[in-house]
C-alpha cells in the first residue's frame, strides 16, 4: 500500500511540475498570454502600425496637435468634392492607423460627409505609446479641435466609433451631448474587461477576467456610459458573424442605451459595413441626422 501511495504521490508531483513547466513556457513565448496574465494593456488592446499607406486619392489635410511635451498627435481632415451633408468625427479601431481605414473613409466622403480622424499616440506618425488614459486624452483634445474647425460649417456633427473606438465614441458623446447630433457604432467593444474575457486563451484567465472588473479600465466603459446619453440618436451596427468582437457585445451596448436608438444586424466581416453595405449605411446615417 505504501508503495502504491508513493507512486501516486510522485505521479501527482510530476503532473504538477509538468503543468507549471508548460504554463511557464507559454507565458514566456506567447505575448498575448503574458499580456493577459500581467494585464498589459499596451499589448492587449492596441496594435498600431507606424507605416502610412498612400492616401493621395482622397482630398485631405494633415495637422499635428501637441498633447503633452513629448506627444504629437496627427489628425486628418477629409473633405468631399461636392456639397457637404455633415461632419463626422471618426475614431478608428485597435489595429493599424488612419490610412488603414481609408477604404472605410472613402464611401463617406464620396457621399458628402466631411471626416475628421485621428491617430492615437503610437499610431502612424503620432508619437508615444498607447494606453487607455492616453488614447482617451488624445481623443478628447482632438474632438475639441474638430469642433473648432467645423464650427463655421453650421452642419450636424456625427461621432462614429469603430471597434475599440466605440467606447471612446460613447464617452465623447456622453460628455458633449449638446454638440453631437448622432452616435454611430460599428462592431463596438463593450468594455476593456469584455475584451480580456473574449480573448482569454484558457478558462482560468477567462474566469480571472470575469471576477476582477476593477483591474480593467473603468474610466470609460461603453456598456455603462451609453446609458447616460439621453436624446442623441444612436445607430449601433454589429455583424452576426463578427469574429473579432462577438455579436452579443453590440447587443449588450444597444440594450443599455436609451431611446432614440436603432440596432442594425448585418452579416459582414468586422466593421466592413461601409464597404459591403455602402448604400444602406449612408441612408441609415442620414436618417439619424434628419
Please annotate each region the language model reported.
Residues 269-279:
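Catalytic histidine-centered segment of alpha/beta-hydrolase-like enzymes
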Residues 151-163:
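Alpha/beta-hydrolase fold nucleophile elbow
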Residues 171-219, 224-225, 275:
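Hydrolase active-site cap/lid region
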Residues 4, 8, 16-66:
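An N-terminal hydrophobic leader/cap segment in hydrolases
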Residues 104, 222, 246-255:
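Short alpha-helix in the alpha/beta-hydrolase fold that links the catalytic acid
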Residues 241-245, 271-272:
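Acidic catalytic loop of the alpha/beta-hydrolase fold
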Residues 229-230, 235-238, 242:
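Short beta-strand/loop motif that positions the catalytic acidic residue
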Residues 68-145:
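Membrane-embedded segments
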